[in-house]
A protein has these predicted regions:
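A gly/ser-rich beta-alpha-beta helix-loop segment of oxidoreductase catalytic cores
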Residues: 1-16, 87
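Phosphate/pyrophosphate- and phosphate-bearing ligand-binding catalytic cores of soluble enzymes
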Residues: 20-140, 147-148, 152, 156-166
Length: 166
């Protein structure tokens, strides 16, 4: 995955990744240029890989400036994201020309829920677990949100979270 937020992406700091290839049970090291990074994707999603280690290339900087940037980003994250409930993070990718959370909110789904699986009332781009939501309930909610948004706006919401099936 090529996670990113606030103008940065993992592709900018990953030097290499050690993976286990489940097709042949070999451990491989992949350099940044071999990872084929794109928006929220890398070769990891297309192959049968499990990430074992990541080597990052970080830059030295002024401690106080780094701390100030960290505090600013932490405050922005805390003010916008539903951190008081369990979630897998941002549920949907940003569709071209739109914001997933705005489409979901405009579709009237903010706060919609199936038992304990909820579209967050704080940020509608997140599906949260307000108790004991099951995998089935979360998947039903994701699929319902996708269906309603498509019916209202003809925009297909693609999941940002990686869904593993049996």
């Amino acid at each position: 995955m090529n996670a990113g937020a606030y103008g940065g992406e993992m592709k900018d700091i990953v030097e290499s990744v050690e993976v286990l290839d489940f097709d042949n049970y070999e451990v491989k090291e992949l350099k940044n240029e071999e990872l084929d990074f794109s928006y929220r994707k890398s070769i990891i999603q297309r192959k049968n890989y499990i990430v074992l280690t990541i080597k990052l290339k970080l830059k030295k900087g002024n401690k106080e400036e780094i701390k100030a940037v960290y505090e600013d980003l932490r405050e922005r994250r805390n003010s916008k994201q539903p951190l008081n409930f369990g979630s897998a993070g941002s549920t949907f990718k940003r569709p071209e020309g739109h914001f997933a959370s705005k489409l979901i909110e405009d579709a009237g789904l903010k706060g919609y829920h199936i038992n304990d699986a909820w579209v967050s009332e704080k940020h509608s781009g997140f599906i949260v677990n307000k108790g004991n939501a099951s995998y089935k309930e979360v998947m039903e909610l994701i699929e319902y949100v996708q269906k309603v948004v498509f019916e209202k706006f003809e925009v297909k919401l693609e999941t940002e979270v990686r869904i593993l099936k049996d």
